[in-house]
Amino acid sequence: LTKFWMLNYVLNERPGIELTSFFNLVYAWNTGVSFSMFNDSGATGTLLLCLMAALIVAALLWWLYREKARAVQIGLGMIIGGALGNLVDRVRLGAVFDFLDFHLGVHHWPAFNVADSFICIGAAVIILHGLFYPEKKENKEQVK
């Protein structure tokens, strides 16, 4: 919804809006993956990225189905939601619409969107859960 709103109402073909000295809303299309890697892969690349994303989402859904830890479930939900949001863009529009642009002077972080943020935050939740709440392994040896 954020991409639709930004694309159709806020930016509406404008190249960008400067909000602060370090943050802009921009009009950017990403045909590649995170941070515009593989951006020039063409129609075949787009199809392969869609298939890969669908397979990853399927694997994450299986993990989510089997997962017991609530924090990991939340993290997986965020990743799945973000991935599906970007997949819908890629299937419908042939590219993912990015609009968040953070920068320091002339040095810009690659533009991204809210779905990308959900993917990164979800991954961080899972990593932090693994670091601070490691899975306890049951001792399967019988004590004699």
Name what the model sees in each region.
Residues 1-144:
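Alpha-helical transmembrane bundles and membrane-interface segments of multipass inner-membrane proteins
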